[in-house]
Amino acid sequence: MKASELRSKDAAELGKELESLLKAQFGLRMQKATQQLANTSQLRNVRRDIARVRTLLTQKAGK
């Protein structure tokens, strides 16, 4: 997910996006723990997307 796509969303949409990313991260972590996750880079990508969303939420709260 690109930061430019996220910047166009408001805080409520970013909150929903964060919630869905956290659920996805949990699912991927469970798959990794049970050794069902073939592509482990997905976990890193989701973690970085979460960081992007949280950064934008912080920036929007400061304005």
From Swiss-Prot:
It comes from the Bacteria. Keywords: Ribonucleoprotein, Ribosomal protein. GO terms for biological process: translation. GO terms for molecular function: structural constituent of ribosome. GO terms for cellular component: cytosolic large ribosomal subunit. Gene3D superfamilies: 1.10.287.310. It holds the Pfam family Ribosomal_L29. HAMAP family: Ribosomal_uL29. Belongs to the universal ribosomal protein uL29 family. PANTHER family: 60S RIBOSOMAL PROTEIN L35/50S RIBOSOMAL PROTEIN L29, LARGE RIBOSOMAL SUBUNIT PROTEIN UL29C. This is Large ribosomal subunit protein uL29.
